[in-house]
Amino acid sequence: IPVEKGVELFVDEVMCGGKRMVVIAGRLGVLDESESTREPPQRLAPDVAGLLAEPARFPFIDRIVEHDPYETLVSECTLDVQQFPFLSDHAIDGTPYLPGVMALEMFAEAAQLLWPACSLSGFDVVSFGLPVKLVRDEQKVRARAWFARQDDAHVWVECTLESDLVNKAGEVFGEPRQHHAGTVRLLKQGAEKPVPLIPAVGLPERGVALLPTTFIYERFFHGPRFQAHGGIIAGSSVNGDVACDGIALMRSELPNGIQFADEPVLLEALPMLIEVGFQNAGMVAMEIDRLQSLPIGIEQVELLQTPEAGGLRVRSVRRAAEADGVTLHDVLIVDADDHPVLALNGVRLKGMAPVEPEMEFKLKRN
């Protein structure tokens, strides 16, 4: 290839901040029997390239496929157990599944690259659909982000997660599969954050775990890298609604904190604390509805602070039972000083299977 063109491609590749080895060349003929070539990378604005240059951020951004600043962005990530060890601890019958909370992290990363001067505030109208499962050694996924609207304080970016249908020969066919969707809420630089929507659930009880982590993970499929629940402190109730208080673990407190091959990694969306909320609400669904449940949606997520120390506690309140085995929950996580850290308004869990009789339990409540 011409020197001038090679230099241009080299600079573009460096500015994209990718993590994998890349060869820039002209036609390779028989040297490329596996058809591993791809189009040149997108040109990125300096502020976007500057963010991507931070090694501990954006672990789910392998490359930018499309980018129209402040309008649309499409990022690509290749999921595999070596690069993302947490996948091995989120597997059913040996098949790894991408956790929904990590899809939210993908959305947050794509949205922040679309509006680089903003910071993450939360999520609205999240729906978890077709799961992403690794039936092969690796699975490519794309996060699509596009500008939705803004006001004086916030920018809203809508996101979807998709993957291609691929046959045994490695050929893409048909329309992309749609997995999850949600709206990322970003706070503008210099804007005053409006009063957050915190559910009226009271404060979780203090104390040691009445039911330890072993009790919880006898009932869940999560391995050590995804065992974010530190145990149940007590059963509780809020205005007649059944609730449960527990211990929430930070990533540094997990039984195995190596979730990524390139640790340390900074995550924008506090995904493991959202996961604690799901698991705590799931324990209530097990107890009251006798159902093993998975999250299918969240009405709103409020990210209130990034905790610097442990001692976090969680309370989830079962608000309603809807049709088809769906239960509705609100969740609040607080720090050791009772300051709110994270709020989940309107978590919907879908019952997937009845709880085995030997796994049923009942918490004491006043």
Per-segment meaning from a language model:
Residues 3-22, 29-366:
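Acyl-thioester-processing domains in fatty-acid/polyketide/NRPS systems
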